[in-house]
């Protein structure tokens, strides 16, 4: 549903474009904001389609893609994470977002099962962490974090701390490696 009023959406958009920083975690990328197209276009980059069900939470291999980015400082090249994995209509890479991490779709069962219904949620290119420049502001989205246990995992905590640091202290967007 509509979480913010039109006025609040406009204020948030202006603040972010003027140099603010936004960190979206897990459900920030679902379809609860689908009526706010600016949000989808600038922060998520793709429309949510579904999450896995069968089982709902699965271990998968997360593969880093842009190790030079400050959000990935001290994050290993690959790591295992249990999550309710999301899928989107397309990869946000198509819209020019900086992809920081993707899923190895061979490492889990990307399907949605419910009674006799089964839907394949493979994307081929399946990002789960990405960044974007929005005017003079920055955004990072991580599709992980459904369960509290995610925040007990040292690698995920490091990624979130790095993201917050980049969002607060970065002087320029886009990030250009030295």
Identify the residue ranges that each predicted region occupies:
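Catalytic beta-strand/loop cores that center a nucleophilic Ser/Cys/Thr
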Residues: 54-135
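A residue-identity detector for tryptophan
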Residues: 15, 22, 36-38, 79, ...
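Structural recognition of the beta-strand scaffold that forms the well-ordered cores
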Residues: 16, 21-26, 72-73, 98-101, ...
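Secondary-structure transition/capping residues
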Residues: 23, 50, 82, 171-175
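Oxidoreductase and adenylate-handling cofactor-binding alpha/beta cores
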Residues: 39-45, 81, 90-97, 145, ...
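A glycine-rich, often tryptophan-bearing local segment used as a flexible ligand/cofactor-contacting loop or short
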Residues: 2-74
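Extracellular ligand-binding/catalytic regions of CAZymes and related secreted enzymes
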Residues: 106-178
């Amino acid at each position: 549903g509509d979480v913010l009023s039109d006025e609040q959406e406009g204020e948030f958009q202006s603040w972010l474009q003027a140099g603010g920083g936004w960190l979206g975690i897990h459900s920030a990328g679902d379809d609860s904001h689908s009526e706010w197209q600016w949000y989808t276009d600038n922060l998520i980059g793709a429309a949510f389609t579904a999450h896995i069900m069968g089982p709902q939470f699965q271990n998968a291999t997360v593969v880093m893609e842009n190790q030079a980015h400050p959000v990935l400082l001290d994050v290993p090249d690959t790591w295992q994470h249990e999550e309710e994995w999301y899928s989107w209509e397309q990869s946000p890479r198509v819209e020019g977002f900086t992809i920081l991490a993707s899923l190895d779709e061979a490492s889990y069962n990307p399907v949605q099962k419910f009674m006799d219904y089964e839907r394949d949620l493979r994307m081929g290119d399946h990002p789960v962490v990405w960044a974007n420049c929005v005017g003079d502001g920055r955004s990072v989205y991580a599709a992980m974090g459904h369960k509290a246990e995610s925040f007990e995992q040292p690698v995920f905590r490091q990624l979130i701390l790095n993201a917050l640091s980049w969002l607060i202290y970065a002087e320029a967007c886009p990030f250009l490696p030295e």
